[in-house]
Swiss-Prot record:
It comes from the Bacteria. It comes from Desulfitobacterium hafniense (strain Y51). GO terms for molecular function: rRNA binding; structural constituent of ribosome. Keywords: Ribonucleoprotein, Ribosomal protein, RNA-binding, rRNA-binding. Part of the 50S ribosomal subunit. This is Large ribosomal subunit protein uL4. One of the primary rRNA binding proteins, this protein initially binds near the 5'-end of the 23S rRNA. It is important during the early stages of 50S assembly. It makes multiple contacts with different domains of the 23S rRNA in the assembled 50S subunit and ribosome. Forms part of the polypeptide exit tunnel. Residues 56-76 are annotated as: Disordered. Belongs to the universal ribosomal protein uL4 family.
Length: 207
């Protein structure tokens, strides 16, 4: 079973934690992770693009000139797709891009992402994370003590307003509860900072 060091808010080690191998120690499935990321990003697309078809463009009901005798190419409408200001053939229409993956696949993707972070030694487990007040400088002190200077995802066992408000003004830092954890944020972060309680809850949810 994989083990990680547990540290306090000052960055000092306070013990070790054995991780559930089924959640944090599997062979990462890159194909499933890719599918999950594509699905998440696709569901975020607005899909509001729209073009006008032949029947939707205003005007163009009258034949612009007679069929023969003018020396010009024949034309039946000034709203032909060939004309400037004309219709669009096979253009985009509003649609939903999102697609759903089976629950087992989504969970496998999350387990793969967490396992890859453990393999890369990019998972930091905090004994506890509690701030007296929602101040950015308080969170900065904690991150500096943990040597976190890049993009990081802070995961707590439940939503904590003081943590969220303390971190939201720090560039590259995101916070989430275990229930809100998603594949894109996990893979897009250089470091994952999880509380000990969050690790336990994650194992309960994904095991």
């Amino acid at each position: 079973m994989p083990k990680v060091q547990v540290v306090n808010m000052q960055g000092s080690p306070v013990g070790e934690l054995e991780l559930d191998e089924y959640v944090f120690g599997i062979e990462p499935n890159t194909h499933v992770m890719h599918q999950a990321v594509v699905g998440q990003l696709a569901s975020q697309r607005r899909g509001t693009h729209s073009t006008l078809l032949r029947g939707e463009v205003r005007g163009g009901g009258r034949k612009p000139w007679r069929q023969k005798g003018t020396g010009r190419a024949r034309a039946g409408s000034i709203r032909s797709p060939l004309w400037r200001g004309g219709a669009v053939l096979f253009g985009p229409k509003p649609r939903k891009y999102g697609f759903s993956l089976p629950k087992k696949v989504r969970r496998l993707a999350l387990r793969s992402a967490l396992s890859s972070k453990v393999n890369e030694q990019k998972l930091i487990v905090l004994e506890d994370l509690s701030l007296n007040e929602a101040k950015t400088r308080e969170m900065v002190k904690v991150l500096q003590a943990l040597n976190v200077s890049k993009k990081a995802l802070i995961v707590t066992d439940e939503f904590m307003e003081t943590i969220e408000r303390s971190a939201r003004n720090i560039a590259g830092i995101k916070t989430t509860a275990v229930e809100g954890m998603n594949i894109y944020d996990l893979l897009n972060s250089d470091v994952i900072v999880m509380t000990k309680a969050a690790v336990t809850k994650t194992e309960e949810v994904l095991a």
